[in-house]
From Swiss-Prot:
This is Cytochrome c6. The keyword Plastid applies. GO terms for cellular component: chloroplast thylakoid lumen. Functions as an electron carrier between membrane-bound cytochrome b6-f and photosystem I in oxygenic photosynthesis. It is found in: Plastid, Chloroplast thylakoid lumen. Belongs to the cytochrome c family. PetJ subfamily. The lineage of its organism: Eukaryota, Sar, Stramenopiles, Ochrophyta, Raphidophyceae. GO terms for biological process: photosynthesis. Disulfide bonds: none annotated.
Length: 15
């Protein structure tokens, strides 16, 4: 799941 998919956007930002 990548940010491009729009599903892990929040997770990526939280990381």
């Amino acid at each position: 799941a990548d940010i491009e998919n729009g599903e892990d956007i929040f997770t990526a930002n939280a990381s």
